[in-house]
Amino acid sequence: MPDAVTTTPRRRRRSRLVSVLAAILVLVLALLLSYALWTVYENTLTTAALDQGPLITATTSGASALSTTAARALKAYGGEAVWKDAVTVESTVTVGGLLFQLKGVNIPAHAKITVDVQRPHTVIDPVDEAGDTGVLDGFSVTILSRSGAILEQRADARDHLQNASVSTHWDRLNLVYFLGYAFWGYYSLPHQLLRTDIAWTELGDGLLQADFGPNLAVHSRIQRFWFDRKTGLLRRNDYTPVAASRDTKAAHVIFEHGISNGIPYPSKRRVKMSLGQYGWVLPFPDFITIDVERWQLH
């Protein structure tokens, strides 16, 4: 009987030890799996991973004197002559991600999005399953019926999104404003390098910082852009969305480019969160996914 009493605590200790070792093993395997996923996560995102050189003395330039990085990027996307005279970009896209699940609203798959390259003006068709159309014009948004009748309108759309919680639900006008200004910024980026009302600062080879000022509908006034040092193509864009709290740090990662009439365009975009401002990017979740199925510059 004493032997049985003595054996039971020993078994319990062994059982606890086995449980602890199993937990450690699971943790190690999880870390190894995370590391494996991280290594195949091609666009992850430190200065070294983006193949950037060391920071240099910051230089600010206007359209008349493009920095080395800006000139390389503009050339990569078709050149100054193409974008100086560009009028519109037409596209077909599918948008998804955790953000729109939290907001409770999204546009249908394969929606047509058209932006005016020269100014913040975007048309989203359709904006919902009813077939209505959403229009962004500066800071105002409108929803039109199929016949063109005005269904809803909001002149101060940015104020309705300013520093909201990520879980705050949106109405259709919120959605149109967010996607409208976002896609205008994404599609017109090469032309933005030529604008005199945007202050571009080269922080390092392949790294630009933009000050958009207070009068343009964009994610945030200050943004950073990482471009490939060899190809000049965009790889990452960091900002704090106007639709999120001030401590939100978004990293917009370009995974793939397509080609339309000889002009490259980002075709697979993923918006993720970064660990601190301009830091490492969390591989998941995807807050926003953008798959561009068709893209045409006019």
What are these regions (language model features)?
Residues 1-7:
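N-terminal intrinsically disordered, acidic low-complexity segments at the extreme N-terminus
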Residues 9-33:
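N-terminal Sec-pathway targeting helices
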Residues 29-48:
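Membrane-interface motif at the C-terminal end of an N-terminal transmembrane signal
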Residues 42-75:
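N-terminal pre-domain segments of enzymes
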Residues 54-57, 61, 75-153, 196-199:
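N-terminal mature ectodomain segment of secretory-pathway/periplasmic proteins
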Residues 61-68, 145-216, 244-245:
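Flexible, processing/modification-adjacent segments and terminal tails
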Residues 130-142, 146-171, 217, 278-297:
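Catalytic loop of the DD-peptidase/beta-lactamase superfamily, centered on the K-T-G motif
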Residues 204-298:
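Gly/Pro-enriched, hydrophobic low-complexity segments
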